[in-house]
Amino acid sequence: MDNPSEPVVVDQNDAPCFEHTVESVDLRTIPIPHHWPQDRGRYSSASIIIAQDNGIRNVSFHRQFLRDENHLVVRLVPRHLRTMVTNARGEGREVSVAVVNAPDPVVLLAAAMSFNENIDELTIAAALHEKLYGRPLGLVEMPNGVHVPADAEYVWWGRITLEDDDEGPYVDITGTVDDVRKEPVIEIDGLTPVSYTHLRAHETLGNL
């Protein structure tokens, strides 16, 4: 944390995550699992959300319920992204986001960290990337302006809207059934398609 590093931005033509794009969004065609019978439906549980708003970037884990072909309902716990969304909504604004699946493990590690201040987790991931691989972490800009790891397997971009909807029930990492809450809705505007998820026991998340 004392020695963050700046990622480098690469062109879309040099970004593996842009090797394939789809013309129309239908998240129902993506292999998003229905983990447990008690769950509300299909959930993306190992994706990270990268949000950018007012010059601040946040990278963090948040589960997302697949509501329909281009909407997710995201469980936001009271940390930095929740604060970012609350502040934006207070001004009547949506928040630009990208849902990222299967980036390099250093990005997953940085996203799992919690800080007491607004630290850009991608600068932590970039420092780890340089330490491990001897080269900078590459980012690419999505059509909505959000920068994501260029080598991620799957990226969806869109907006956290002003709408809330039911999220849950969901079998959480503790094995208990989480409550139903009103949570923000993400509208997905595009995606670049290999999807990654935590299996039922959530071992990966538990180890983080």
Task: Describe every region a protein language model picked out.
Residues M1-Y170, G175-V185, D189-E203:
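Extended, highly charged
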